[in-house]
Each structure stands twice: as structure tokens, then as C-alpha cells.
Amino acid sequence: MATKLPRRDVMGTATVAAAAVLAATLPPRMARAQATPPVPKVEYTPKKLAFDPAKVPGLSEKLLTSHYDNNYSGAVRRLNAITAQLAALDVAAAPVFVVNGLKREELIAANSMIIHELYFDSLAGGGEPSGALAEALTRDFGSLARWKAEFAATGKALGGGSGWVLLSWSPRDKRLINTWAADHTMTLAGGRPILALDMYEHAYQMDYGARAAAYVDAFMQNIRWTNAQALFERYARET
């Protein structure tokens, strides 16, 4: 049975398709790839899940598989399509609205791919953080309990809408911060995310319907702290 695509994916696909049709009808002087230097071919492939989707308490295999196959992998496919269209376009001669539309969708698809990979890497864990990350969370939020409360509350505040909650390292301030993002293009400038919570409806509606808060609670019980710890230590060393 076909799976209904979320509005964000439908809109993105429609935009890419419209740009492709428009690019195909441009005058030859605008559409010729040879009019500008050739672009190296780039092909993105979905990153394999690092866990068994049938073994994540509170999140069903059906939900996680649909999320991975349709939303994450769909973003990868969309990014490949946009990249190919840009490579074939004489960007110096193309109308500005064509370039603007393709570059906007390229950013959305690229960030969707990258943040989804962090989201899946953030799952299938449990327990509590340890070591330098635990110390930093206590230092920057007052306590681990306070961080949990703020992170979960931010996710629940997005329930019924869409977006992301990211725990990010700020190289500027040398501290951890929870950031709110209404779409794939809103992130902390210079921030390095180490943990991602997907609050788009496709991440929970199949299991929880409108009960977004219950999904957030399930996520909080499944955080893979070893992944967050490794990212935190790497980014902290770099700054």
C-alpha cells in the first residue's frame, strides 16, 4: 500500500519538479551545461541504521521503518535530484528565481538528510550520560534533570506542528544549548548539534496520533548517549 507523503515532502517534490520543467524549457543559451564549467558528479546514499528498528521501546518498527524509508531516504533522493538539476543548469544565465528556488530546496534537502542522520544516531540507547558530557550538561543547565526538562518541554511545545529540537555545542560560547527549529533551515549559527529530536508529525503520528508529548517521553528513554558523548568530546576539542 502506498504511503502518504507528508506535506513538506510533497511541497519539496513539487518545487523540484516545477524547477526541472522550467529548466527544460529555458532557451538553449541558458540551459546548456557546457556554457559553464562542468560540475563534479555528487551522489548521496542513505546511511544505514545502526540499530534494529524492531527493538526500540516505545517506537514501533513500522514507524521507524516508514520514517527511514520515506522521509529520510526521500530527502536523500530529493537532494540527488536537485544536485543533478543544478549541475545541468547554466547558473550564470538562468533566471534568478530558478536559481533561488533550486538553492533553497537544496538547503532544505541537505539539512533534512544531515539532521535525520543525527536523529537516528541519537536513538536506541537509554540510561544516563556520563563523563565529560554529563559534567557539561550539569555545568550549562544546572543539573541533568533541568536539561531533560527543558529539552523535553521544547519538543512538546512543537507537538502538532513541525520542527526539530537540537542539543548543540556553541564554539562561540563554549557551552551546550538546546535550540528550537521550526524547519530544516533554522539552526544555531556555528553550532554543532550532538543530539536531535524530530518533531515533524511523520516521526510519531503513526504510533501516537496527536499525542506528541508521549512520543517525546519515549524518545527521552531511548537516547543513545554514547553517540552524543563522542560528538561532544570531538567538538569541544576542536574549539
Segments from the language model and where they lie:
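N-terminal secretory signal peptides and thylakoid transit peptides that target proteins
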Residues: M1-A18
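Hydrophobic/aromatic-rich, well-ordered segments within soluble, folded domains that form packed cores
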Residues: H67-Y68, S73-A75, I114-E117, L195-Q205
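Second-shell loop/turn segments in exported
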Residues: S60-Y68, K103-R104
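All-alpha RGS (Regulator of G-protein Signaling) helical domain and cognate RGS-like helical scaffolds
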Residues: P37-E43, N70-S73, N80-N178
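Acidic/His metal-coordination segments adjacent to aromatic residues that form catalytic metal sites
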Residues: A54-P57, V96-G101, A182-T185
